[in-house]
UniProtKB/Swiss-Prot annotation:
Keyword NAD in annotation: no
Annotated protein name in UniProt: Vitamin B12 import system permease protein BtuC
Sequence similarity: Belongs to the binding-protein-dependent transport system permease family. FecCD subfamily.
Swiss-Prot/TrEMBL GO biological process terms: cobalamin transport
Transmembrane spans: 21-43, 65-87, 94-113, 117-139, 152-174, 241-263, 283-305, 310-329
Record bears the keyword ATP-binding: no
Species of provenance: Yersinia pestis
Amino acid sequence: MQTSQLFTALQQRQRQRDYRYLTGLVVMLLFALLISLCAGDVWIWPEHWFSESGKLFVWQLRLPRSMAVIMVGASLAVSGAVMQALFENPLAEPGLLGVANGAGVALVTAVLLGHGLLPIWVLSTCAIIGALLMTSILLSFTRRRLLTNAQLLLVGVALGIICSAMMTWAVYFSTSLDLRQLMYWMMGGFSGVDWRQQSLVLALLPTVIWLCCQGRVLNFMSLGEQQARQLGVSLHLWRNLLVLAIGLLVGISVALAGVISFIGLVIPHILRLTGLTDQRRLLAGCAFAGGGVLLLADVVARTVLSSAELPIGVVTATLGSPLFIWLLIRVKGVK
């Protein structure tokens, strides 16, 4: 009885600590949103948000962009956490395993075939199909146990390099100005996002919320196939549903902002290091932290140069690469 009471008390203490972390992440997200609405070539502080310039810069330009950044950051971070559980690989991430590049190839192909005249919903659908196809290929390797985790990571990186090369060749031989601009966009950026793209931004929200509610299933799946089946989890059904959700999030994110790496890799690991290990609360934490971190990266991309805007993919890669190397060393040390 005492052991049971002690276990219950420890669970309650862990839950309270997790909720404190989640509250802190929400505060960080709101702070990042405040900075994002103020920052730019012209800094506009809250007391001037309802002036003539504030109505233009804050409400018409920065607010829709910030909403898109939050949803894309949340989508990539949650997708990364789900992929790490689904592939049983701590280094799985949409950008690193080539899923985002697969979406990019499909999108570039659609631009080429449509001569730059296709509507945004068609391009988004193509990006989703590309992300789904790449995720399904990787999942088939995992389910058949043909590759170790390290080999799967290398295959994903190789597929991503192939996709990146295909996009580069397409742009090199194209005479279309739209496609050359698209190549810059594929480096990651939100400069073209305004209120017209908010239907795509809102399309991310229900999928992110649904994934955040599947922590219990992911906890069961992490116990192993046999234990998960004994607990009543249909692995085939849930794998397909999770792959579909990941493809949807990554495809729409690529259609909105291009390929942005390392958010899906670094955010879940940092949160686990702080003690958020239960998937039921880790996924929500990833959504808040992913949105906040990408907002701050977007502020850096907008303000670090006075005459131009950096691609946000460059900022996240610069900040994420050292952390990725550290994670590789740490995972090897744990093994």
